[in-house]
Amino acid sequence: MTTDASNNPLLDFSGLPRFDAITAEHVTPAIDHLLEKSYAVVAALEAPTAEVTWDNFVAPLEDASELLGRAWGVVSHLNNVVDTPELRAAYNENQPKMTEFGTAVAQNEALFAKYKALRASAGFDALEPARKRIIDNAIRDFRMGGAELPAEQKERFAAIQEEHAAVSTRFSENVLDATNDYKLTVEDEADLAGLPDDAKQAAKALAEKEGKPGWMFSLHFPSYYPILQFADKRALRETVYRANATKASDLGEVFSKREDWDNTGNIVTLLKLRDEEAKLLGYKNFAEVSLVPKMAKDPEQVIAFLEDLARRARPYAEQDYAELSTFAKDELGIDQLQAWDIPYASEKLQEARYAFSAQEVKQYFPEHKVVDGLFRLISSLFSVTIAPDTAPAWHKDVRFFRIERDGKLLGQFYLDLYARAGKSGGAWMDDARGRRLGANGQLQTPVAYLTCNFTEPAVIDGKVQPSLFTHDEVITLFHEFGHGLHHMLTQVNELGVSGISGVEWDAVELPSQFMENFCWEWEVLSHMTAHAATGATLPRALYDKMLAAKNFQSGMQTLRQVEFSLLDMHLHYDFQPDGAKTVQQVIDEVRAKFSIVIPPAFNRFQNSFGHIFAGGYAAGYYSYKWAEVLSADAYAAFEEAQALGEDAVSETGKRYLREILSVGGSRPALESFTAFRGREPSIDALLRHSGMAA
């Protein structure tokens, strides 16, 4: 095992992470070394001082925390994108140590007292606003971390944090393992009628890789979803739907082999731990705890917001479903729509109504044109240039870029676009390094990870074919890049509130959802399309059809997101984990009250709902819709500017950069939004953009 700190690549902070050298054996020595140093810093800072200042207290604590956080961030990232037994073991060995340290700091009464003393000192008023906000956030976090609890309760609180981290990790691992384990082989090509050629080619390649005949499908989204959307064989759609809807549950395909992959018990454990944590802190429920650092005032406000949105969307959703049911019966011979019919029937209905298909559109979005078009838009909006750069990466398909303005480096990012075994599903942005101005006056620029799970390029007859993106995948890429811009274009020099740091969780989706809107602009799309076979730009007539179909089934889609948000809130607000009611009953009650499309009784989507059980969205999934109000209203400012000409659009872009992206978490999100928009947010733009305006 590598124990020499001087030779451990995970401890090299001189530049970018050395992904070409870091292995699982480096993790424990590096984390132990950094924890030892961090505990020593904390011990030194506990000692009484004549005066508490930023420089003699906050800065050294941030220095130690940042190095530990950066190293652990690399480990966590690798665990998400190149899962191996060795790396997983190293991660699980060290996660409890990290949790223990975080809790020890959060409950340290001496540190807490010093933050409060600094807040009350005469020197506080002389600090710049970003530093004041960091101090206020720290005091809040100490209180929420149990610093004010009596000793016995502190001990229990710490145990809760450690167990919660372990169970949450186990939840994620179960989803990943169940996803990777499932393989469906189809040997008769006739069973794949309706499936696009590129989906069949990918399935053929997977079968060959696994040494199997025919075509093989997995539960990775680019593999299974084309079956639900395009396969004519209803039984095949049902098979794949059941497998995906029951993964990591007692009803899953793999349950007979690995009962420990069932997340049902983990969900209950997590809810119990969160409820106990809330009670220890003096709150009625975990939803109240979750909302302390957010824009929303209380759970009642969130529930009222969601129920109001459901009320507005329901008439449109009912109309959507009635039309789909009639079409399925009359045109497809499906008398009773089932869950595995809805994507298929919806695709057929959209083709019939708007005379185009998602597969037709996909041919115009080869990866290189989409990425180039995205970069072109960013350059135009924010006066920056994006260029390829070099850095060690964790996989051969990962690319690295730099963002500059007037020759000055602003930030860098890794782009990891393709789905693969050992990589967690979904799409996300995370920070590898935050912007910070050091005590020596040297600026540390931000670095981001941008991760998606799109279909990798296919090799046909020895020739590599470009990866083609669906329009939904284009939107996903723009979404994640919006997060990346928030992180990389910040001008705040204090680590705790630069970029995405310190931004309220229900506002952090504003920049990401804002970027999605550009995926519907002709001037943007016309520069990022080229037909895979002919090279032709997206025809204006096809674009017009896409635009006409933009709000296709928006009522159903809105209700689906509201359903997820409400069940998340109710599980953390008025559900009693030790009571007679089960998690499934709560979900069923929410669906009965608000849903138009009720999933089958065997559906266990919650068993892979990583956002709230293995991510940061517990009692916070509503943030997507909450922030969509902000992002739609922000984009409406650009729509208004377009009517006034290019100069107005340019000025609006500069104002958005100045008031939203640049300031990061250095001030409240509502203050930033109001500075940009000139008023508080309105839901009107969201309803209009969704085709649900009154």
Q: What label would you give each PLM region?
A:
Residues 456-478:
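Short pre-active-site segment immediately N-terminal to the catalytic Zn-binding motif
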Residues 66-77, 140, 242, 342-349, ...:
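Short, hydrophobic/amphipathic alpha-helical patches that form generic packing surfaces
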Residues 19-31, 53-58, 259-263, 302-309, ...:
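Membrane-entry segments of alpha-helical transmembrane domains in multi-pass membrane proteins
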Residues 2-29, 33, 193-194, 369, ...:
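C-terminal, non-catalytic "cap/extension" segments appended to globular domains
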Residues 2-33, 80, 87-297, 396-399, ...:
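His/Asp/Glu-rich acidic catalytic environments and adjacent acidic regulatory segments
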Residues 38, 42-45, 61, 68, ...:
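Amphipathic alpha-helical coiled-coil segments
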Residues 130, 134, 163-169, 173, ...:
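Active-site-proximal, well-structured secondary-structure segments within enzyme catalytic domains
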Residues 35-126, 559-571, 575-592, 599, ...:
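C-terminal non-catalytic alpha-helical accessory regions
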